């Protein structure tokens, strides 16, 4: 179903069954598959391909040669009906690729809202990208990666499969991330190692002075105290009882399977 207020360029192909919302814009030479849903006000600039069971929210801007919902690169994939979901107000720049999930990974690749995916960024099968994240040029997420809210991943950075990039993390460019990055941390290098707390980013997002001090103390317990990881976890949990900002660390530890970068 195509809303009567949507614009479809004469050279675009919108297959029967696709749902195109009000005031959406499908530019020249775009291809929209039969199981695709595109929300109100979303713009496909030109030469964009959206395929598979893909749902895109409202007011997104998707630039030329982006490919969304295409068959993933997992060798186990055998054509199962897996999905891609994208939220609202994202900017998805030229040649970005977002692949559909796998049955083994839950069947869903998901991107939240208000994100910026710069040129050539890649979001592999079963990844989850939160809200207000930035993936810079050529940033690459392997399968099953989680990127939490407000995280920034620098250009040319590769993230190993199943890794977690915590909330408010800043990963420097040209890095290789092979373990989980705790929230609030600046990471850099190959393999990526911690370089302190993302203080400037947290200030811009309105964190209080007291909250910043608590986050720094949690970071020091994890990385500067000489304690074992289990010992640091216990003390960080105690700190989290007094400072809600620190709870992000304890929640991260519960999810982490690859262990924090060291």
Curated annotation (Swiss-Prot):
Belongs to the transferase hexapeptide repeat family. LpxA subfamily. GO terms for biological process: lipid A biosynthetic process. The keyword Isomerase does not apply. It is found in: Cytoplasm. Disulfide bonds: none annotated. Involved in the biosynthesis of lipid A, a phosphorylated glycolipid that anchors the lipopolysaccharide to the outer membrane of the cell. Keywords: Acyltransferase, Cytoplasm, Lipid A biosynthesis, Lipid biosynthesis, Lipid metabolism, Repeat, Transferase. Its main location: cytoplasm. It is an enzyme of class 2 (transferase). The keyword Transcription does not apply. This is Acyl-[acyl-carrier-protein]--UDP-N-acetylglucosamine O-acyltransferase. One of its GO terms (molecular function) is acyl-[acyl-carrier-protein]-UDP-N-acetylglucosamine O-acyltransferase activity. Pathway: Glycolipid biosynthesis; lipid IV(A) biosynthesis; lipid IV(A) from (3R)-3-hydroxytetradecanoyl-[acyl-carrier-protein] and UDP-N-acetyl-alpha-D-glucosamine: step 1/6. It comes from Salmonella heidelberg (strain SL476). InterPro entries: Acetyltransf_C (IPR029098), Acetyltransf_C_sf (IPR037157), Hexapep (IPR001451), Hexapep_transf_CS (IPR018357), Lipid_A_LpxA (IPR010137), Trimer_LpxA-like_sf (IPR011004). The gene is lpxA. Its EC number is 2.3.1.129. GO terms for cellular component: cytoplasm; membrane. Homotrimer. It catalyses: a (3R)-hydroxyacyl-[ACP] + UDP-N-acetyl-alpha-D-glucosamine = a UDP-3-O-[(3R)-3-hydroxyacyl]-N-acetyl-alpha-D-glucosamine + holo-[ACP].
